[in-house]
Amino acid sequence: MRFRIVSSKKGKVCSLPCEACYQPHISKIVTSILQGKPVSFVLPAFPGKSPNPSKVLGTLPDMAERYSLVFLNDLCKSIEKIYPPGAHILICSDGRVFSDIIGMKDADITAYQREIDAIITRLDLTNLSTFNLDQLYTGQDFDCMRQELLDVFGQPIALLKEKVRRGANEYASREDREANRMYSGITKFLFEDALFPGQLKSRNEIQKDAKVRAYGVIQRSNAWSNLIAGQFPEHVRLSIHPQTCGDLKLGIRLSAESRITPWHGVALDIGGAITLVKRHEAEKLAAQLINDENGRPDYYKL
């Protein structure tokens, strides 16, 4: 639970250890232990790089992704110290699910997914593997994949809007509060991603557009989550987003020092210690840009 991220309500955060937080997951963990198998986790993450060049270096994974993948693999390795079979994290790349809504090219998603797999192989990160929409809906074009996902696992936008509205109420259900919280978070990310040099819209126009697109992203994201739950029912469910006490998912960091995800930032080497920041923040510090062995921008160094 050290790297867990929790969403607090009115400033209150559950204490650890917390029985309510363990309850949704303990039976899956116990089952794995009784069978002598690694504890399996599933994490929707690593969708593809943000389209905002003020946040990232490009469209392909760089040191930021490598750092986070090693972090997750090391986390699994640390479990081996107390439970020898250890743990395994299945990364469910969700970029294909909503790329057309957030301005990511499908070709870039394909290249990103392939490079993530290559990194896992190259660095021998044996506690990690990946799953994506392409593996499930083979032989279809990307638009058909997304539509089939919605047809089978999606819910109407109108229903989602009602949940978000109810979630703003102090006495809302856990599910409605989660919908409202997720809507606010996704709207913020979409707003930030659209604020880049050269764009011509006003901040007010960008905010309105982000609010509309956020519903589509959440609709797709929820459908992907439902698919994953059905495909991998024995896996403990993780999330890159903060989760409230007793939720069906555990929120988790992707690095020890930062809440920024690698696809929304860059790696910054500060005297040998790596942290994740947004590109413009690294440049504001006058950090030196370091290229990889192929001459591609990779990370910043102070």
Describe every region a protein language model picked out.
Residues 64-84:
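Histidine-anchored nucleotide/phosphate-binding helix
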Residues 1-69:
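N-terminal regions that are enriched for targeting/export leaders
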Residues 29, 71-78, 115, 119, ...:
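Charge-rich, solvent-exposed alpha-helical interaction surfaces
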Residues 95-259, 269:
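A substrate-binding/cap region within the structured catalytic cores of diverse enzymes
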Residues 31-38, 80-86, 232:
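Flexible, charged surface loops at secondary-structure boundaries
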Residues 248-302:
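C-terminal regions of proteins
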Residues 36-54, 90-98, 130-137:
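Short loop/turn segments at strand-loop or loop-helix junctions that form parts
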